[in-house]
């Protein structure tokens, strides 16, 4: 390793202008360092910029997600709903960007196409889509866990004559602003019943002539329970921001919930059902995150809650055949992120809504007229692909990132990511991944956990600059220990039994299948404790030079 380090034009490049990216850029600038942010969109917002479909909103309590308000960056901010809609969330991020004056550090309508680590100079060369190359000491990815949209591999997908689009690329007008898609009198098809589809479907059903929902795998969905935010509640929350922040930091996922200390198997059936009923009626993720402590550890305890929610689905959906198709049979309750819904199940009681089970009759092709399955053809005017994302690592896979010895990140992580603290990977010095694989912000309330992680990264970078270090890379031993621990912790939970977005599945040339978790599931407090220990011990586990 060379002992010299060439001075780059920038201290850091931050990829992404979502809630975590703009905060990281702000912190680096505040510390007196030169930073450039790169954002593919026209403005800040991240997920709230790209996802503008009808029904899009937070599944986190607004006040608990709003780190910029909790931290006093925009203390005057007032939420209008307990679970804010996408337009309100975009206004919130824009207001925070104004307060931090962060846009001057960004280039918008710009993509990073490649990044190459130059070993002799200890810097990154970052190539933009206009072929310009900028150099930086630290490269920081803040692209988000769900930003690389995924279209299904269906024959004829480009042949459709009507309107079609992925849910995260909703149509825009000539100026780039989102335009409403009028479903009135139209035959609409929605492919996918994950969190996005669950939000779109009830809205589309209100005006569509006919709505066809193409479902392969049902999800466990529970009521969001949204309501307006009263002035009295908003004033009370604002007065308690420091306390609220400390509380959410104390929970495993930074949502405002602690698990019940009891085991589901230790409670009588009547007491259990009364508890489930109470949780089901509460707004938000309480039923997932404040239930019995063994929900995701014990199959019997999990089945108690799954059976309860299945009973609710049967009560809400009038057609028993449809109800059964909407009840998951392939994964435990909560082994996938639970979609929060508003009148989702009641939507299937409408005469104009039709559930198409594509596990029984798979989609064969998209035709100019619509969708053809194994047993029917559906003429459509609009097709919405609510088909999700290449999660967590997908956005990085789409950038040609090359570390030491010209090794590509996508090759290094071919069978699953390997990291230290989920923040750096060996072979890719000075490259940080915020809300990335195996760190404490991804299986978490990103609004808070991403902000806390950005603060830690700033501390490490500042420590390096103060001590004359220009190089950081995990030791092989530290990376191996962390990665093995992440995989082991995940495998002990029922999360390992679902094909959720946080599991990467790879088929090897010999036909064998490798499943690797993309997330750290041991809880935010434990994760931050580990990170603090590393920092306190002069960033042990990292090679600094």
UniProtKB/Swiss-Prot annotation:
Swiss-Prot/TrEMBL keywords: FAD, Flavoprotein, Monooxygenase, NADP, Oxidoreductase, Plasmid
pH profile of the protein: Optimum pH is 9.
Effect of residue 53 to A: Loss of monooxygenase activity
Cofactor binding note of this UniProt entry: Binds 1 FAD per subunit.
Residues holding FAD: 20, 39, 47-50, 59-60, 65, 112, 446
Site (Transition state stabilizer): 337
InterPro entries on file: FAD-binding_Monooxygenases (IPR050775), FAD/NAD-bd_sf (IPR036188), FAD/NAD-binding_dom (IPR023753)
UniProt keyword rRNA processing present: no
Entry keyword Flavoprotein: yes
Gene3D superfamilies referenced in this protein's UniProt entry, alphabetically: FAD/NAD(P)-binding domain
Listed transmembrane segments: none
Top-tier EC class: oxidoreductase
GO molecular function: FAD binding; identical protein binding; monooxygenase activity; NADP binding; protein homodimerization activity
Catalyzed reactions per annotation: [(1R)-2,2,3-trimethyl-5-oxocyclopent-3-enyl]acetyl-CoA + NADPH + O2 + H(+) = [(2R)-3,3,4-trimethyl-6-oxo-3,6-dihydro-1H-pyran-2-yl]acetyl-CoA + NADP(+) + H2O
Temperature dependence as stated in the record: Optimum temperature is 20 degrees Celsius.
Alphabetized Pfam families for the sequence: Pyr_redox_2
Cofactor: FAD
Induction info: Induced by (+)-camphor and 2-oxo-delta(3)-4,5,5-trimethylcyclopentenylacetic acid.
Effect of residue 53 to F: Retains 32% of monooxygenase activity
Any one GO BP annotation for this protein: (+)-camphor catabolic process
Its biological purpose: Involved in the degradation of (+)-camphor. Catalyzes the lactonization of 2-oxo-delta(3)-4,5, 5-trimethylcyclopentenylacetyl-CoA (OT-CoA), a key intermediate in the metabolism of camphor. 2-Oxocyclopentyl ethyl acetate is also a good substrate, as is 2-oxocyclohexyl ethyl acetate and methyl-substituted cyclohexanones, but free acid is a poor substrate.
Subunit structure: Homodimer.
Designated name of the protein: 2-oxo-Delta(3)-4,5,5-trimethylcyclopentenylacetyl-CoA monooxygenase
Source organism (scientific name): Pseudomonas putida
Gene: otemo
């Amino acid at each position: 390793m060379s002992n010299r380090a060439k001075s780059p034009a920038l201290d850091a490049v931050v990829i992404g202008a979502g809630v975590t990216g703009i905060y990281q850029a702000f912190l680096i600038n505040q510390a007196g360092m030169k930073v450039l942010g790169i954002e593919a969109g026209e403005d800040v917002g991240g997920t709230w910029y790209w996802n503008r479909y009808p029904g899009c909103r937070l599944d986190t309590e607004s006040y608990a997600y709003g780190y910029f308000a909790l931290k006093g960056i925009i203390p005057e901010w007032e939420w209008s709903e307990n679970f804010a809609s996408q337009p309100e969330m975009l206004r919130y991020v824009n207001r925070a960007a104004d307060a931090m004056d962060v846009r001057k550090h960004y280039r918008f309508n710009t993509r990073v196409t490649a990044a190459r680590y130059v070993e002799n100079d200890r810097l990154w060369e970052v190539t933009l889509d206009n072929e310009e190359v900028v150099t930086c000491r630290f490269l920081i990815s803040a692209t988000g866990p769900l930003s690389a949209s995924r279209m299904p591999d269906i024959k004829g997908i480009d042949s459709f004559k009507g309107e079609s689009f992925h849910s995260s690329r909703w149509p825009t007008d000539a100026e780039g602003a989102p335009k409403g898609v009028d479903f009135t009198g139209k035959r609409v098809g929605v492919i996918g019943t994950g969190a996005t589809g669950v939000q779109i479907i009830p809205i589309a059903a209100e005006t569509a002539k006919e709505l066809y929902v193409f479902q392969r795998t049902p999800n466990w969905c529970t009521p969001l329970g949204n309501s307006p935010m009263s002035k009295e509640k908003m004033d009370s929350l604002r007065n308690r921001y420091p306390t609220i922040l400390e509380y959410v930091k104390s929970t495993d996922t930074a949502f405002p919930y602690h698990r019940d200390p009891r085991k589901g198997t230790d409670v009588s059936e009547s007491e259990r059902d009364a508890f489930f009923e109470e949780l089901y009626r509460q707004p938000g993720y309480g039923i997932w995150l404040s239930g019995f402590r063994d929900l995701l550890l014990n199959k019997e305890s999990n089945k108690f809650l799954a059976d309860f929610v299945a009973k609710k689905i049967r009560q809400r959906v009038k057609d028993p055949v449809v109800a059964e198709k909407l009840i998951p049979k392939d994964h435990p309750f909560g082994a996938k992120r639970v979609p929060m819904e508003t009148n989702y199940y009641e939507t299937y009681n409408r005469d104009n809504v039709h559930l198409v089970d594509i596990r029984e009759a798979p989609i064969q092709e998209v035709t100019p007229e619509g969708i053809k399955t194994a047993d029917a053809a559906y003429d459509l005017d609009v097709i919405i692909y609510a088909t999700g994302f290449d999660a967590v690592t997908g956005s990085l896979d789409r950038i040609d990132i090359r570390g030491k010895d010209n090794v590509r990140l996508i090759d290094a992580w071919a069978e699953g990511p390997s990291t230290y603290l989920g923040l750096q990977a060996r072979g890719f010095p000075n490259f940080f991944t915020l809300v990335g694989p195996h760190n404490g912000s991804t299986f978490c309330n990103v609004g808070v956990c991403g902000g806390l992680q950005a603060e830690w990264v700033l501390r490490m970078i500042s420590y390096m600059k103060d001590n004359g270090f220009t190089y950081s890379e995990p030791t092989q031993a530290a990376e191996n220990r962390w990665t093995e621990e992440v995989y082991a912790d995940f495998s002990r939970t029922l999360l390992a039994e679902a094909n959720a977005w946080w599991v990467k599945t790879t088929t090897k040339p010999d036909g064998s299948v490798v499943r690797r978790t993309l997330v750290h599931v041991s809880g935010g407090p434990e994760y931050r404790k580990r990170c603090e220990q590393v920092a306190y011990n002069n960033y042990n586990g990292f090679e600094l030079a």
